Design a protein with these regions (language model features):
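N-terminal structural segment of carbohydrate-active enzymes
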Residues: 1-57
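Active-site-adjacent "subsite" loops/lids of carbohydrate-active enzymes
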Residues: 3-10, 15, 77-106, 111, ...
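Surface-exposed amphipathic alpha-helices with a cationic face
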Residues: 24-25, 109-124
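Conserved, mostly hydrophobic/aromatic
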Residues: 32, 116, 175, 182, ...
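Aromatic- and acidic-residue-enriched segments that line the glycan-binding/catalytic groove
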Residues: 42-78, 131-158, 195-267
Length: 269
């Protein structure tokens, strides 16, 4: 069985390309994935915290491995390459603009890839499946009409993941253009790994996505009865958001095993 590890750029920016790759090789890693961005410390109050706050839950976390000598800090990022803009012509979403950080640090990505390849480690690039511009999970995101929807058609008020609808043609077109661009910029990689090609269930509402009109159109093409699905899921959503009563609890307590009554409740809602 192959062993794969994701190593984000900030770590080998700090600890050195050769040092990181040597440790991976010593651990007999078969493949690595990294992402096409670079990072630096920032003093801008609007910069991102590392580690991420993650909707407040991560605000007490500290880094296990320090970055730039700190276990928590503000950072800014930039793409590690200069995008080929003709690939994105006419698209809703655009790649991030290179900065001075790109020019100064961008070469660390191909250096890391070459160092891994020289040790017979497969190299992959990891990008976000539905968070344009896709380089890093903590920035970017979709426009409102490309966001996942609840069965009542609304956008959840509280989400951690900023993923767009996986059926959005705008996001699909951008992802195709980004894929072409990455293969142009890094032609020697073994593959591309699309991170978060799902709706991560951090909150209860996340379980009830996606009823975006883009998904309705996809369901029709695939022969699914989307209105029936939407009505059934909406009924369950309402049951779990204010519709539960003592009667449901009594059914739970009526048997030694709570699983079967719960399943019956969910199926008979």
């Amino acid at each position: 069985m192959a062993t794969g590890v994701t190593v984000l750029p900030e770590h080998f920016q700090n600890e050195g390309v050769d040092a990181v790759v040597e440790r991976l090789a010593a651990a007999r890693v078969d493949m690595i994935a990294t992402s096409p961005y670079v990072m630096e410390p920032s003093t801008d109050p609007k910069a991102s915290r590392e580690p991420p706050i993650d909707a407040g839950a991560g605000s007490v976390r500290l880094l296990d491995r320090p970055l730039w000598g700190k276990r928590e800090l503000l950072v800014s990022t930039a793409p590690s390459f200069t995008p080929h803009l003709p690939f994105y012509r006419g698209l809703r979403y655009r790649p991030a603009t290179p900065t001075a950080l790109t020019q100064r640090e961008g070469n660390v990505i191909p250096r890391f890839l070459r160092a891994a390849q020289s040790r017979h480690i497969q190299t992959w690039l990891q990008v976000q499946a539905a968070i344009p511009p896709g380089y890093r999970v903590q920035f970017g995101g979709p426009q409102d009409d490309d966001k996942p929807r609840l069965p009542d058609g609304s956008i959840p008020k509280r989400r951690l993941a900023n993923n767009g609808s996986l059926a959005s043609p705008h996001i699909l077109d951008y992802t195709l253009a980004l894929t072409r661009d990455l293969l142009r910029a890094y032609p020697d990689i073994d593959g591309i790994r699309f991170d978060w090609p799902e709706y991560p269930p951090y909150f209860l509402d996340d379980v009830f996505l996606d009823f975006n009109p883009h998904c309705a159109a996809a369901a029709r093409r695939l022969g699914f009865d989307f209105p029936r699905m939407q009505q059934a899921v909406l009924a369950l959503y309402r049951l779990l958001h204010g519709g539960l009563t003592n009667r449901h609890l009594e059914r739970q307590l009526a048997t030694d095993s709570g699983r079967q009554p719960l399943l019956t409740t969910l199926l008979d809602h």
